[in-house]
A protein has these predicted regions:
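N-terminal presequence-like segments and the immediate start of the first folded domain
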Residues: 1-62, 66-79, 86-144
């Protein structure tokens, strides 16, 4: 039977009443739940300084990195991202955040970006779920 381990990161504490896991390591594959910039985005909105899609995407990608590192991995292990946005017009801002996050990597993960009618809280503009394999590195990706 393939080993399964729940991954936790100090930068992304599990909610006490959550009915999900932020990340599971199944063998060498890390599967991450959809991540948002909550609660930081809500706190910023309450101060009258709402975070734009670029800022939210950077927070979320930082959470993805924290979970990867907690599992013993790195950004080069990411092979698939699903990006959900509430405004398709934000796709360029999300793209900029991705360029910054994957700077120097060469090969980007496969990705889907779709517009959705809403996320769990109204101030959220971006949600990302991710898959990684600890036994691959996209920095060493061959071209077909």
């Amino acid at each position: 039977m393939t080993a399964v381990r729940r991954i936790r990161a100090a930068a992304l504490p599990d909610l006490p009443d959550a009915s999900w896991s932020n990340a599971l390591l199944v063998g060498e594959e890390l599967v991450m739940s959809g991540m948002t910039a909550h609660p930081a985005t809500r706190q910023a909105a309450e101060r009258g300084a709402a975070r734009d899609a670029h800022a939210q995407a950077r927070v979320v990608l930082g959470q993805v990195k924290a979970l990867l590192e907690a599992a013993g991995g790195h950004v080069g292990n990411l092979y698939k991202l699903n990006v959900y946005v509430t405004r398709i017009a934000d796709k360029d801002a999300i793209g900029r955040a991705r360029q910054e996050f994957f700077a120097g990597q060469g090969t980007f993960p496969a990705s889907t970006l779709v517009e959705v009618s809403g996320l769990v809280f109204p101030e959220l503009l971006v949600e990302i779920d991710a898959w990684a394999r600890l036994d691959i590195d996209l920095a060493n990706c061959d071209e077909a």
